[in-house]
Amino acid sequence: MARDYYEILGVSRSADKEELKRAYRRLARKYHPDVNKEPGSEERFKEINRAYEILSDPEMKARFDRFGEAGVSGGAASGFSTDFSDSFADIFESFFSGFGGAGTQGRRRTGPVRGDDLRLDLNLEFIEAIFGGDKELTIKHLETCGTCNGSGAKPGTKPQTCSTCGGTGQVRRATRTPFSSFTQVSVCPSCNGSGQIIEEKCVDCGGRGQKEATKKIKITIPGGVDNGTRLRVSNEGDAGRMGGPPGDLYVFLSVKNHPEFQRDGINIISQIKISYLQAILGCCLEINTVDGKTELTIPSGTQPNAILTLEDKGVPRLGNSVSRGAHLITIEIDIPTKITPEEKELLEKLAKIKGERTGKGGIEGFLGSWFQQK
């Protein structure tokens, strides 16, 4: 089954380089085999690496966008041909050992940390997606604890610098072999990499500095959204740590089907059925549109499956609500299987006027095979 690398990373096809990197970092932390021991986490981790490997390379990304997985199946190995150094430095520093002299050895882990982004899936009614509007959402996210202001320490106290690691969040162990020596770096077991020790924890948050909260927010859905549209709500993700900024909330939209209308880009599509007499003579009918009832003129001589167009009755163009698509109506012509004697008599007269042959079975010309007397 073909894989969608955008879906694996949980981003849209319009995601920029920074969005891809943030999504990759978040997922890599979550599914790294040294952290996540659940079955399937290692395969998921490999999938995430592969997706970022392709989408972070402009050439490979362009090939994937055009041809799908087939366009990149031979273009990169399953290793890391793309430069992951920046991402790995942040993500894996606490998982892998490093050698003496490496640039990450003295890095402190106690600086501000941005909060995680959150995802919310929202299912819209067909008409809501076309015209947009305000929606009230209930979200759950982490907020900075108001009692300790995010420090995790009991009010009146403050975190202390970890004496084991000196506040770096890392410990080093020198190892000698018959051939060389190197320094192994790992997460400080005393402070778990934070560089700080909380001796008296805040009773409200248990020392975490954050509390889960339920919140109602109002967002505006722009007109013209469709399945897969992603809306970003700034600063409504999880709160940051150690004074870091909050993450963002991403709302992924899906649209319910409509019993009468279909959508093709910015055009609305529907079907109506008319009688053969209406098709021949023409008529004016009231039909449904997304704007409500409107009149549609059926020209005389309309053929089966003809498409009539109502301009500016379609979907507003996303980002430019003044510009709208069209409503395309496919005409289906209802041919009766039985007719009354009076109808038959009139049709036979019409057939004679048109020069059609009639016989024992009725009209033998164009209309003959369509009708039977009741």
UniProtKB/Swiss-Prot annotation:
Domain of life: Bacteria
Comment text on domains: The J domain is necessary and sufficient to stimulate DnaK ATPase activity. Zinc center 1 plays an important role in the autonomous, DnaK-independent chaperone activity of DnaJ. Zinc center 2 is essential for interaction with DnaK and for DnaJ activity.
Positions that bind Zn(2+) 2: C162, C165, C188, C191
Protein name: Chaperone protein DnaJ
Function summary: Participates actively in the response to hyperosmotic and heat shock by preventing the aggregation of stress-denatured proteins and by disaggregating proteins, also in an autonomous, DnaK-independent fashion. Unfolded proteins bind initially to DnaJ; upon interaction with the DnaJ-bound protein, DnaK hydrolyzes its bound ATP, resulting in the formation of a stable complex. GrpE releases ADP from DnaK; ATP binding to DnaK triggers the release of the substrate protein, thus completing the reaction cycle.
Principal subcellular localisation of the protein: cytoplasm
Gene3D superfamilies: DnaJ domain (1.10.287.110), Heat shock protein DnaJ, cysteine-rich domain (2.10.230.10), Urease metallochaperone UreE, N-terminal domain (2.60.260.20)
Cofactor note: Binds 2 Zn(2+) ions per monomer.
Family under the similarity heading: Belongs to the DnaJ family.
Residue numbers binding Zn(2+) 1: C145, C148, C202, C205
Protein localization: Cytoplasm
GO biological process: chaperone cofactor-dependent protein refolding; DNA replication; protein refolding; response to heat
Domain J intervals: 4-68
